[in-house]
Amino acid sequence: MRKYLPLVVALLLALCTTALAQEAKPSPEPSPKPKPAMSKAQIQKALIATEKKLWEGWKNKDPKPFRTWVANDSVGITDHGTETKADLLKEIAAGGCEVKSYELSDFKLTMINSGAAILSYKGVADGTCGGQPVPPTWSSTTYVNRGGKWWAVAHQESPAK
Protein backbone atom coordinates (compact mmCIF):
# COMPACT_ATOMS: atom_id res chain seq x y z
CA MET A 1 0.00 0.00 0.00
CA ARG A 2 2.87 2.35 0.86
CA LYS A 3 4.45 1.89 -2.51
CA TYR A 4 1.24 3.16 -4.21
CA LEU A 5 0.92 6.24 -1.99
CA PRO A 6 3.32 8.43 -4.02
CA LEU A 7 1.50 7.39 -7.19
CA VAL A 8 -1.91 8.29 -5.72
CA VAL A 9 -0.60 11.67 -4.50
CA ALA A 10 0.91 12.39 -7.92
CA LEU A 11 -2.38 11.54 -9.65
CA LEU A 12 -4.35 13.73 -7.25
CA LEU A 13 -1.95 16.64 -7.85
CA ALA A 14 -2.23 16.17 -11.60
CA LEU A 15 -6.03 16.15 -11.43
CA CYS A 16 -6.11 19.24 -9.20
CA THR A 17 -3.70 21.10 -11.47
CA THR A 18 -5.78 20.22 -14.54
CA ALA A 19 -8.99 21.29 -12.85
CA LEU A 20 -7.50 24.60 -11.74
CA ALA A 21 -5.94 25.29 -15.12
CA GLN A 22 -9.26 25.15 -16.99
CA GLU A 23 -10.52 28.42 -18.31
CA ALA A 24 -13.34 29.83 -16.26
CA LYS A 25 -16.55 30.01 -18.24
CA PRO A 26 -18.40 33.27 -17.80
CA SER A 27 -21.75 32.88 -16.19
CA PRO A 28 -24.54 33.45 -18.67
CA GLU A 29 -26.13 36.87 -18.67
CA PRO A 30 -29.51 36.75 -17.07
CA SER A 31 -32.07 36.99 -19.83
CA PRO A 32 -34.76 39.59 -19.36
CA LYS A 33 -37.74 38.13 -17.63
CA PRO A 34 -40.83 38.01 -19.79
CA LYS A 35 -43.66 40.25 -18.75
CA PRO A 36 -46.08 38.30 -16.63
CA ALA A 37 -49.29 37.45 -18.41
CA MET A 38 -52.12 39.88 -17.79
CA SER A 39 -55.12 38.66 -15.86
CA LYS A 40 -58.54 38.72 -17.51
CA ALA A 41 -59.47 41.73 -15.34
CA GLN A 42 -56.33 43.60 -16.47
CA ILE A 43 -57.03 42.80 -20.12
CA GLN A 44 -60.64 43.97 -19.76
CA LYS A 45 -59.52 47.23 -18.13
CA ALA A 46 -56.98 47.86 -20.91
CA LEU A 47 -59.44 47.08 -23.71
CA ILE A 48 -62.19 49.25 -22.20
CA ALA A 49 -59.68 52.12 -22.03
CA THR A 50 -58.79 51.55 -25.69
CA GLU A 51 -62.46 51.40 -26.71
CA LYS A 52 -63.11 54.72 -24.92
CA LYS A 53 -60.16 56.30 -26.78
CA LEU A 54 -61.72 55.16 -30.06
CA TRP A 55 -65.11 56.61 -29.12
CA GLU A 56 -63.41 59.87 -28.09
CA GLY A 57 -61.72 59.93 -31.49
CA TRP A 58 -65.10 59.47 -33.19
CA LYS A 59 -66.68 62.20 -31.05
CA ASN A 60 -63.80 64.64 -31.69
CA LYS A 61 -63.35 63.69 -35.38
CA ASP A 62 -59.77 62.67 -34.56
CA PRO A 63 -58.40 59.77 -36.64
CA LYS A 64 -55.27 59.36 -34.47
CA PRO A 65 -56.74 56.77 -32.04
CA PHE A 66 -57.94 54.71 -35.02
CA ARG A 67 -54.47 54.78 -36.59
CA THR A 68 -52.98 53.79 -33.23
CA TRP A 69 -55.33 50.97 -32.12
CA VAL A 70 -57.08 49.60 -35.23
CA ALA A 71 -55.14 46.94 -37.16
CA ASN A 72 -54.45 47.53 -40.84
CA ASP A 73 -56.24 44.26 -41.68
CA SER A 74 -59.30 45.08 -39.58
CA VAL A 75 -62.91 44.90 -40.69
CA GLY A 76 -65.88 46.90 -39.46
CA ILE A 77 -69.46 45.69 -39.78
CA THR A 78 -72.18 48.34 -39.70
CA ASP A 79 -75.69 48.78 -41.04
CA HIS A 80 -74.04 49.97 -44.30
CA GLY A 81 -72.01 46.77 -44.75
CA THR A 82 -68.33 46.09 -44.18
CA GLU A 83 -65.52 48.62 -44.10
CA THR A 84 -61.74 48.56 -43.96
CA LYS A 85 -59.48 50.67 -41.78
CA ALA A 86 -58.97 53.00 -44.76
CA ASP A 87 -62.76 53.38 -45.12
CA LEU A 88 -63.06 54.12 -41.42
CA LEU A 89 -60.34 56.79 -41.53
CA LYS A 90 -62.06 58.46 -44.52
CA GLU A 91 -65.37 58.41 -42.64
CA ILE A 92 -63.79 60.04 -39.57
CA ALA A 93 -62.04 62.67 -41.72
CA ALA A 94 -65.31 63.48 -43.54
CA GLY A 95 -66.82 64.43 -40.17
CA GLY A 96 -70.39 63.40 -40.99
CA CYS A 97 -71.22 62.91 -37.31
CA GLU A 98 -71.81 65.52 -34.64
CA VAL A 99 -71.50 63.86 -31.24
CA LYS A 100 -72.05 65.83 -28.03
CA SER A 101 -71.52 62.96 -25.62
CA TYR A 102 -71.60 59.20 -25.31
CA GLU A 103 -71.84 56.51 -22.66
CA LEU A 104 -70.50 52.97 -22.78
CA SER A 105 -71.86 50.35 -20.38
CA ASP A 106 -72.54 46.66 -19.77
CA PHE A 107 -69.04 45.53 -20.73
CA LYS A 108 -68.35 41.84 -21.12
CA LEU A 109 -65.01 40.32 -22.05
CA THR A 110 -64.86 36.92 -23.73
CA MET A 111 -61.37 35.46 -23.97
CA ILE A 112 -60.90 33.33 -27.09
CA ASN A 113 -57.39 32.40 -25.99
CA SER A 114 -54.52 34.24 -24.28
CA GLY A 115 -53.97 36.43 -27.34
CA ALA A 116 -57.50 37.11 -28.59
CA ALA A 117 -60.58 38.57 -26.93
CA ILE A 118 -64.01 39.97 -27.73
CA LEU A 119 -65.19 43.04 -25.83
CA SER A 120 -68.95 43.56 -26.04
CA TYR A 121 -70.88 46.50 -24.61
CA LYS A 122 -73.75 48.94 -25.06
CA GLY A 123 -73.04 52.34 -26.59
CA VAL A 124 -75.37 55.33 -26.36
CA ALA A 125 -74.46 58.62 -28.05
CA ASP A 126 -76.11 62.02 -27.99
CA GLY A 127 -75.54 63.15 -31.54
CA THR A 128 -76.33 62.82 -35.21
CA CYS A 129 -74.75 61.21 -38.24
CA GLY A 130 -75.89 62.41 -41.64
CA GLY A 131 -78.57 64.46 -39.91
CA GLN A 132 -80.11 61.39 -38.24
CA PRO A 133 -79.97 60.68 -34.50
CA VAL A 134 -77.33 58.13 -33.52
CA PRO A 135 -79.22 55.05 -32.30
CA PRO A 136 -78.04 53.15 -29.22
CA THR A 137 -76.05 50.06 -30.18
CA TRP A 138 -74.86 46.75 -28.87
CA SER A 139 -71.29 46.61 -30.08
CA SER A 140 -68.42 44.19 -30.03
CA THR A 141 -64.78 44.62 -30.88
CA THR A 142 -62.45 41.69 -31.39
CA TYR A 143 -58.91 42.34 -30.21
CA VAL A 144 -55.76 40.36 -31.00
CA ASN A 145 -52.49 40.70 -29.13
CA ARG A 146 -49.68 41.14 -31.65
CA GLY A 147 -46.21 41.72 -30.30
CA GLY A 148 -47.52 42.69 -26.88
CA LYS A 149 -50.07 45.24 -28.13
CA TRP A 150 -53.82 44.66 -28.31
CA TRP A 151 -55.13 45.59 -31.78
CA ALA A 152 -58.79 45.98 -32.79
CA VAL A 153 -59.22 43.60 -35.75
CA ALA A 154 -63.03 43.55 -36.05
CA HIS A 155 -65.87 45.76 -34.86
CA GLN A 156 -69.61 45.35 -35.29
CA GLU A 157 -72.66 47.30 -34.18
CA SER A 158 -76.30 46.27 -33.93
CA PRO A 159 -79.16 48.60 -33.01
CA ALA A 160 -80.13 48.24 -29.34
CA LYS A 161 -83.84 47.79 -28.75
Q: What is each PLM-predicted segment?
A:
Residues 1-23:
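N-terminal export/membrane-targeting signals
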Residues 22-68, 73-161:
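A beta-strand edge to alpha-helix "cap/lid" segment located at domain peripheries
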